[in-house]
Each structure stands twice: as C-alpha cells, then as structure tokens.
C-alpha cells in the first residue's frame, strides 16, 4: 500500500496502486506482484456535478468517476477508506470534495485534473456527513451531518480549518446551497421546514445567524399565529381569575413551552422539495402540493406564485411536483416524477408553464454547465443526458444506465475483448473490455439470477427466477440472440456454471436439484438429467482438466439444524453425450448413482464457499463464522454414507464477513472475496496471500462475485450493493507467474478454439435459417390465422417444466403397463357408485332426523379424514374463540364487579313506595382508605391545635390586660367564660357564610376555615379534606335512615304476606274472584339479583356431557322409584280415611260453607207418591237446610268483615310507610342539594389551586426564560466587547498603513531632491500614474447565457488581481518609459519606490474593506444585544404583571353564599364586576326603598308627559315654519338657476353628436395609452430612484465611516479641551483683570510661535526620518555590525 502522506487514504487515479505488497512470509515466487484499477463502471446514485465546463463527476462505490464530455474519456479517483459518501465540486477552483463513511468520517479535497490531494478536513462528526456544498465566491465549504450531531459547519478548505459551526437537533436537511452571488447566505431545506443562514465575518471570526421561513398552509394561504410567549389578545376574566397562555395551563416550564402548540392549533404546511437562488438573492421553492413559492431572503416574505393561465396536463397526470429546480434567465426549469421537464417563465408574481423535454422515467437532477451552454439531465435509474443549446442534435445520451442492479458478469472466451453483464431485471449487456463501452444489449423481460459464458462455444446461459435457462448466441457481439430456452423446473435457478472445457452446463435450483445439460448448441443443449442435493445450494465447483476423461463436481449446501455444511462429490464422464439416455438416467430424468459415483462429506463447521482443487483431491473452504480458510483432503478409499472431513490445513483469512472462494484457470491460485470488499489472491499450496486489493467496502456489503480471464490478465469484480463493476489488471507480475499461467492457458485455448470454430459455424448457419424463418413467419401471419391455435398449443407445451414432462412421461408409461388392472378398478368403482347412488336416493326419502349428510356417502377415506380433520379444526377454533370470548367477558365481569360492587362498602340500591311513584336511592359509598383516614386525622388534629392556640392567645392577651387591675378578678373570670362561649359560637359560621346547609344533617363545621380566610395552598387542601369528610358523614347519616326504612319495608312486606295467607283463605272460602295483592322487592331494590343467574332465565338447553348423562339418569331413576313408593303409601292412607270417617278427621267452622245436607232418596219420586214419614223427613230436611243456610250467611258475613279489616290494616300500614318514604325522599333531595353545595365549594377550591399552579408554572417559565436571555445577553456583551477590541486593533493597523502611505507620498520630492526640479515633477506625475488592470473579458454569448452575470471574486481572485497589477507595473517600469536625461539608477530607485507605494495602496484598500466589514459586524452584534435587552425588559414587565395578578388572585377569593328562597342573581352579571365596595343588606330594606322610588317615579313621569305634549306642539310649529322658509329659498334659487343656466360645449357636443359613446371610447383609449406611457415612465423613474438610493446608501455608509473617524478625533479634541479647562481651573484668578488679559495675550503669542517652531521641526524630523530610512535601505547590505 502506498505510504505517501498525500495518498495515505485515497488513491488519486485509475492507474494508482490498488493492492498491498505480499506478506513477509509469502513465497519469493510471488514477491512484487500487485494489481491496479484499469477502469470502473458505475452509474450515479447521487447527483452528478460539473468540475469544469467540459468535465462531470459522480461517486460510485469506492470511486469518483470523471467523464470528459468532449472525448468521453473516464478518469477514476479511488477512496481506500471505503465507500464514497457525499460529494461536491467547486468550479472556479476546479476542486472536488467528498467524504468517506467510516467512523469519524473525513472530508477530502482533491484538485482536478491532477487528482492530487490538497487538504484533509477532520471534524468532530461521529457517523456520517449528509451534505457538502462549496461557495462560488471564496474558499468556503459547508458540511452538514445527521445523527447524532445535526451540525452545520463552515470550513476554509484551503486552511483545513472550521470557521464556525452550529448544531440543530432533530433537523434533517435534504438540500443545502450557497447564494451564488455571495458567500454570506445559505439556504437549508427539508420536507417540512426552510431556513436562511447568514454568515457574518469580523476579520478572522465567523458567526452563523439563522432565520426560519414561515411556510404557508397546504392550501397556499397564510396563518397569522399569535405570540404564544407573551400573548396580548388573551381575554380578561374578572370573576374566575387571570387567563394564562396554553403553555402555562399545560404546566410547561422549560424550552418546550416556547414552541408549544395544542394539537388542534397545528395545521399542515406546504412541504418543500427543492429550491434555487436568483440573481437578486431571492429563492424559488417547489412544493409537493404543486405550488411554487418565491422567498425574499432579506425580509423572509413568502409569495405564492400564481399561474398566468391554466397549463393542460395529460390525462391522469398528477400536479407538477418538482423533484429538482434549476434557475435560468426569466424563470426556472423543473422536473418531476412524470418525466417531463417544464419551463417556468416568471414575471412578477405569475408564471407560465411550457413543456421543455420529455423522458420515460422521473428526472431527479438538473444542472447547468458553468457556461450555461449545456444542461445535464439525470434520471432516477442513473442515466445521464446532455442537452446542448443551439446544437443540431441538442440531446445526447452520455450514460445509459442498466435496468436494475448487476447480478453477474462473465468473460466471453477467451476473455481478452468482451464480457457480459446481467442485471436483476433480465438485461444482458455486451461490454468491451478495453474501454468499458456497451456494445449491445438484449432484454429477456424476466427476473434473472445467474449468468455464465460457455468456454467451448460463443454462447451464454442465463438462469431466471421462474426456472428457465435462456441460451444466447453471442457470435456477433453487436447483435446477440436468444436461440434456445429450457424450462427446467418451477423452482428459481440459483447457480449456472460450465466446466473448464465447456462440456457440461450445471444448473442448480433453490429446491436442491442440479441439472446436467450438454453445453454444445449443435446438440440443442440436450438435458441429460438431474441429481438431487440439499436445498439452498451455495456453490457448484467443477474440475475438468484435459488429461482426464471425467468432470469432477463438488456441491456445497448448509445443514442449518446441525450447524454444519455438507459437500456432495460426483463425477460426469466426458463420453456421456454419446451414451444412450436410458443408460445414464431413469424414466423421471434422475441420473443414476452408478454413473455419477456420488460421495457425501460433512465438515464440523459452516462454510460459505468451497471449491475443488485440480490435483491431490483437495477441497478448499471459506468458513462463514470464523475468519479461516481450510483445506480438506478427500480419502482415496470408497465409502458409503456421510464422511466427516477434518481440516488438513487452516490459514487465517484476514477478511471479515462471509465470503466466496474461486480457483484460477490454471488451478494454482485461490481467489477469495468477502463482505469487507477486499480481493485476496493466494498460493494454492501455502494458502498465503500474495496480492491484496480493496475494490469495494463493507458499507456496500462487499463484493458479490468476481471473474478472471483464462489468461489471468484481467479480473472483473462486482459490488453487491454499490452497483459498481471494477476491472483490475496486473500492475506488476513476475515472469515465472506469467509463464505458468501462459503455459496452462495456451493449450487450453487451442483445444477450445477448435470446438469454438465448429460451434460457431453451426451458430452462423442456424442464425441465417432463423432469420429466414422469421421473415416467412412475418409474411404468413399477414395471410393465415388458422395456425394460431397450434402456436398457442406449442407455447402451452413449453410452459410445462422439463422435470414435470419427465414425470408425466413416466406416469404414462406406468399407465400403459397397468391398464388391465386399471380397467378392473374402474369397473368396481362404477358398481360401487351405483350402489351409493341408490343409498342416497333412499336417504332423501327418510325423515330429517334420520337423514345423513352427503359427506357420509363419500368413499374416499382420505377425503373423509380430511373433512373430519377440517371439522375438528373448525370446532377447535370455534371452541377456542368462544373460550377466549367467555374468558374476556368473565374478566370484564370481575373487573366491573370488583369496581362497582365488591369495593363498595355501601351498595347502591333503591326503595320504592307501595302506592305512589316515589323512588328513593341511597348513596353508594366506598370504604375510606388508610391514607385518607390518616390525612383526615392529621388535618383535624391540626385544626383543633389551631383553635386551642387561638384560645390561649386570647387568654394571654386578656390576662396581660387585667394584671394591673387585681380587684376585678371575679369579673374577669366571668368575661373569660363569656369569651369561650363566644369563641365556640363564632367557630360555627352562619349558613349564608358557610355556603351550605350541612349543619342540618348534623355535620360538624366547627373545624372549617372561613371562606374569607382561605389564602394559602395548605389551607385550601385541608379545607378540601374536611369538606370531603362532611360529605361522607352526610351520606352515611342518610344511608342509616335509608337502611332503617329498608328494614321497615321488609317488616311491612312480611306482615302483608302473613295477612295475605288469611285473605287468600277467605277469598277461597267465599269463592270470590278477587286477586291477592302481594308486594315484592323489585330488582332495583335487590341489586344483588343481577349477580345471580336463575335457571328460568336461561333460554338455551344446558349441555350435558355423556358421562354426566348416565349419572343423572341414575339419580332420576332412584328419585322416581322413591316418588312412586311415597305416592302408593299416600293413596292407601287416603282410601282408609275415606272408608272410616268420610274423608274428614275434624269438622271445622270453615267447612260450613262447603257442607251439603244429602237429600232423602224418596225425593226422586213425585210428591203424590210420598208417604207421611217421607213427608216428615222432608220437613226435617227443609228445616236442616234452612238452619244451614242461616249459619252459612252468618259465617259469610263474618268472613267478609274480617277480609275488609285485613285489607284496611294492610292499606293503612303501607300508606304510613309511603308517607315515611315521602319524607325520606325530601330528605334525600335536601341531602343531595347539600352535597352539591359542598362539592361546588370543593370544585371552586380545586380551580383556585389549579390556577395557582398555572401561575406558578408561568412564573417559573418566565424566570427560566429570563435566565436564558440573561445568558444570551452575557454572550452578546462578550461578543460586542471582543468585536470592539478587534476593531480598535485593526483600526490602529489601518491608521498606521494610511500614515505610511501619506509619508511615502510626502517624502517623494525629498527622496529625489538630488535631481533637477522639472525631472522631479515628471517623476511625480509618473509616481501618481497607475496601470489599468484589464479584466478577463468573457464572450458575449456566455455573458448573455449565464443568468448570474459577473459574480464577486474570491480571495484567490484577489491574489490574482494583485499579481496582475504587479505584472502591469512591469510594463510601467520598462526602461522605455524613463524620462529623457534621467539616470538609470534613479529610474530603478523610482520604480522600486512606486512599486512599494502601489503595494501599500492595495493593502490600504484591503484593510479598509475589512474595516468596513468589522464595523458592520459590530453594529449587528449591538443590534442583537439591543433585541435581547428589549426581550429582558419585556420579561421583567411580564413578571411584574404576573406577580400583581397572583397577589390579586390570592386576595380576591371566590366565596359561596347561601341565598333565601326567592333571591336570585342578576342575569346580566357584568353590571357589577367589582365587589370591593359591596355590602350584604336585608332584602326587605331594598324592597321598601324600591316601592318609594317607584311611586315618586310614576308621579314624575306623569308630569313629564304633560310638559312633553306642550313642547312637542311648539317644536312642530317651528319645524313647519322652517320648512316653508326653506321651500321658499329653494324656489328662488331654482328660478335664478334657470335664468343663469350655462350650456357648455360638451353638452352641445353631446346633443349634436349621434355616436357620442364612440367618441368617449376613443378618448378613453387615448387616455389608457397615455396612462401606460406614464406608468412605464414612472417605473423607470422608480428604478432610477432605487439605483440612486443604493448609491446614496453606499455613500451613506462611507459617510458613516468618515463620521466615525471624525467622532474619534472629536473625542481626542474634547479630552484635550477638558485637560486645558482643568489646568485653567487650577490656576485660578489671583491677579487683576488687566494682568490676566496681558498674560493671556503673551501666552497666546508664545504658543503661536512654539506651534510654528514645532511644525517646522516636525516637518524636518519627518524629512530626516525618511532620509534616514532611505539611506538605511540603500546601504543596508553594506552595513557591518560594530
């Protein structure tokens, strides 16, 4: 590796060394070998930049590629430290800056075209730079970094120093640019914000000043946001306290309070995408929403440009969403995702849109060349176009990017001229190896995965994702053709490789099949068969040497479950194409094992790559988890099964990440690549590295693949993610190494050339026949359409994979063999189908319960099992869903029950009346926690202590007051007792001051603080705790009353139930149809019923498991047996009772109503047939019936009376309960009212506490903000002090330079005093003469094209101007310009003096410009200091106002007052907002006063009405009189006007002219033209005035500098005057006026003389000093130290 300090990190050209020297332990055979970069192919993923007018550059991988637009020649600059990060160019200085992407990245500055490193910029950035930007003027470079710093830094790239930097946390910038007109302004934009940065300089100090741009809303309107820090529009609320900003309400006290916005107040803004600068230092900004903005960078005013006319967009096209903008004269060019470049012509605040160019894909970048003759256009794919203005063919395609990422590369045999590249989208390109130019392309229109070129024929094979292998004819590299395609399987093709002699093509798929195909196109790429291996094949390695008759194949695939890798080794005989297919593969295309001789090996660790050595049966493997390369020796003996290989040799790879190992064409080199991006070439025997080259980096995930040509002279390396292809060549290669590879490649190339020639002839003939067939097909398609079905059939046949075709052929063969047996099975199936059909018909006729499903008749056991499994899965899924739903509902039930039932000490329930619709609810209550009880006891103890302290204080005061009067001790004791009673009374406040009726419920309010005394936070919190205790006690007291009423209702219901038993008996005895009224508790009265589910509430039948059904059946049968036995016993008892006693054990009184006297049997006969005895018996029977009826009536009346009595008692008891519950309801309403009153007090106190917290938050924020501003004030004061000191020092240097310049001017004649006077005058004229510095004139067309015109120069240009000035001085110093008669030595002395004078003047000019800049810097720092000071004063005023409001809030308390019934508040409460003078008085007094006032007011109104009528009549008469006078005046005036009527010429013209409107229109047109001319003249005058104002501004600045100088001089004069005044004051007035005047006169004369003498001496001294200096300079070389 190069050790040059200028090239320690970056290699500066394509021919620079890209490799390191061999290790010390390597063989001397390979010493001195190294690789270098030949060329690099990559397409831009970042923006392309111009380095000069004819060269562009862009980064690609580890390289920066430069392209000359005229010659198309490429130059490469390599970054050894890894992938190139961001890049920028500076056209005036022709330098390139780019960063790397390592930890703590570095920025490199390179000059072009020498590509030498000028500087290396090291900052404090940890991760990555995201943006770089050069200023057009000056040596400034801006860099921006992302996470974690978000830092903008300004560099002096020539001095490698950071001038200033500033961090912006969270600001992710997408574009950064300098103002092209000056380096003082920058613009940073992201998708959500824009900011303008101003760089201010004071000598060597630089300072950033940031200003954010307020973007419009998404609809292009502007939002006026109020000041959230110090709002001035907040409403005033005199009742509820001060209204504070939202940040204080949110409780924010830090920096977040400054930018806090509620979610509802945040509106979506426009999203900038790109911006560009104008010559007037304005900004054009494009937005995602399609709007175009113009921003004035001085005022930050945003203008939304409007379309002058609607631009028609294509159908379905989106809005013009510019991805990039570039400025041109009178407008901009913009491009978007639609691939169209639009030209915007902007005038004032409107623009017109025109289509400039159209492309297929989105255009991502536009940039003009420095001369603005060319426009560079870059697409999203990486293609680059150059549009040359004024050319015949303006659009030129410079870079044609590939369609997708490069997947693979392969040399076209022998690998000395061309190679192929394959992209992921299926694009195959033929590229020249000499200059990397693309010769041809072919699109396969499918996703491709692998590529390989055949060594034995001019063909290539491409593997695709859909399982195809396409064969390409590359005999003619300018027009490749697809000649064959093989659909192997539906699995994607992963690896395609040829053996070294090009006999076989091996294709590996993802599913683990390796297909063996004949590589010769003359054999139509015959597929020999496939062999099965493991999935995810990593690599297929082959060994095919000329001396061998077999091709050895090694396949590597992983065993992830075992953490190992498996190797499969098999051989393919060279004579395989001549063998009959049945001998090497079976019917399904699988290669036979006895032909391939397959062996399995395993290694104990995972390998990412493995290759097979040419000799010694060696395997070389690259370990994936450890950095080692191992070699394994395959045993000579045959084996079966899997053999574990042990490492034979192990070498540390010194490469990190998984890699791939390759074998050179002669088999002596091992080439390894890895994720680190380093290519290592090793000796096969020692496995030591002798060449190491870093072409890619780990940031781009290293190298994907590499290829070496047959002669070993060229190596292609393809990156994985950086899309960069690098061609390496040998920079130094030993003669022995070259001879080795030449000796191997020559016979191989000779052998292959014979096969290539024969196959080329076949391909050429097949190409001609294919062309003829295509022509015939084209003609036939015009006439015949009947063959389309046959072509589609062929295509359909081709869509079947080869492996499936083989499978189908094998199946067809098996079908032919087993066809008789098949027919028998089909016959049996048909008979079985008929039987099943009959069974299904019978099934349709049975009942629904007995009917079977159609699935039950399916005889397919697998199908039945599948359906059964599906049903089981569905049932299990439903069961799981139901269980989860039930579990969720159960969990929710438990939560609700725990929260609303279990946690309640008093459950909520209702109580209803029996007869009236009154419902009384109790108060549900939770048990107070231990913490609440402790707080309550603490507060109560504190309040009791305070009361006791108050009593003791009063006692102490009273004792002290009565110590002087000892005689009245007894009276004092009585007074003390009265005071105690008074204290006890005053502790309980009256209800109207207490604010509630809580005392009516027995609440103890003696501990409550008066509402007029609640000031401190602690008192308010204690008051809340006490009020909550009062509410709790009120609820508890009411609940006790409710519980008593509830128990009473239970008793009443029980009593009614007892009485209803007797009532039911009476009703049944009386056989009445009345219903018994039975009161019951409802669900609201018994809420616990909701937690219990009764059986009658369940509508679904309960599911009983089979094992439970048997158990239930046993229990039911046992119960039925017992019931039958009990019924049998009861039946026997009943029959015995009926037989013995007629069914009655005891005759009761209730039985009278049911008693019936049986009729004698003779009553069935007629009366005439009765006997006397029978008649007597009938009389006795009638008597008994009469007596029974009388007894029955008496008993019925007694029952009715008893029934009425019971009903009345029930009605009375329930009515009494209803009355009691009615009173309880009123009590409930009152209790709720009292609770609401107490809760209202609590809410008021909580509101006051919340407002107090808001005030404290606001105060804390203001204090923090004040501290922040004070720190800013300190910093600005320090900056002012430092700037002032620097200005004073610099001004002193400037004054010294000015003084030296004046001395040089004044001492000129004395310098040349020894020559003649006229010669001195001539020389002085020449001394004042200055050369004209000719500016480099640009061409007129270039000046007209460049929109920015001539821009101010940089420091480099200033140095060039000085050099040019000195060069012009050489012309003036020519001897030909010497006056006649002048000594040449004098002329030389004159020239040196004049040159010194010119240099000094240039220095003075530079110093004056720097002095003006420093003065401006100081003025801006003072302005910033004034702004900060104003903000500090504002904060102080806000703090004072806030403290006043806080005090006012603490004093003005919200008091809750009870009003009597009938007293209401005023609706318009704003009538009286100040209650400082208000008092509470009795309502009756006010009503009496109002009645008196009302009576007196009525009397006054009556008298006023009477006087009003009189005044109204007087006013009416006066009004009529005035009206008549005015009408008279109007008539007189009208008569006079008629007499003096003026009839002008215009009126005459109007009457005489028939087309008066046309005349007026002509006059209006003339006036409009006049107005337009006046308007143009006015605009010109305005422009002239603006120019004049600019000149006056510059003149004013000059005058300011002069005034500043004069003010400094005036300050010195004032000091001198003050000193003289002090001296005069010390002398005093001791002498007389005459003497004093005389002395003054003498002193003035002496002073005048002394001044004259001092001036003369000063002039002489200055002359002598100049002479001494001249002599010293003249004789300095000859001076000898004493």
UniProtKB/Swiss-Prot annotation:
- List the expressing tissues: Expressed in testis. Expressed in the lung, brain, oviduct and nasal cavity.
This chain belongs to the protein called Cilia- and flagella-associated protein 43
Outcome of gene disruption: Mice are viable and show no malformations. However, homozygous males exhibit complete male sterility due to severe defects in sperm mobility. Sperm from mutant mice exhibits teratozoospermia characterized by short, thick, and coiled flagella and sperm axonemal defects. Females are fertile and give litters of normal size. Mice display early onset hydrocephalus and severe mucus accumulation in the nasal cavity.
Which GO terms are recorded in the biological process aspect for this UniProt protein? Answer: brain development; cell morphogenesis; cerebrospinal fluid circulation; cilium organization; epithelial cilium movement involved in extracellular fluid movement; establishment of localization in cell; flagellated sperm motility; motile cilium assembly
Organism, scientific name: Mus musculus (Mouse)
Q: Does the keyword Signal apply?
A: no
Q: Is-annotated flag, keyword Cytoplasm? A: yes
In the record for this protein, the WD repeats are positioned at 168-207, 262-305, 315-354, 358-397, 488-527, 697-738
**Primary gene name:** Cfap43
Please spell out the taxonomic lineage of the organism that makes this protein: Eukaryota, Metazoa, Chordata, Craniata, Vertebrata
Coiled-coil annotated residue ranges, if any? 926-960, 1171-1223
Subcellular location(s): the record lists:
Cell projection, Cilium, Flagellum; Cytoplasm, Cytoskeleton, Flagellum axoneme; Cytoplasm, Cytoskeleton, Cilium axoneme
Q: Which UniProt keywords apply?
A: Cell projection, Cilium, Coiled coil, Cytoplasm, Cytoskeleton, Differentiation, Flagellum, Repeat, Spermatogenesis, WD repeat
* Ranges for region Disordered: 767-790
**Protein role:** Flagellar protein involved in sperm flagellum axoneme organization and function. Involved in the regulation of the beating frequency of motile cilia on the epithelial cells of the respiratory tract.
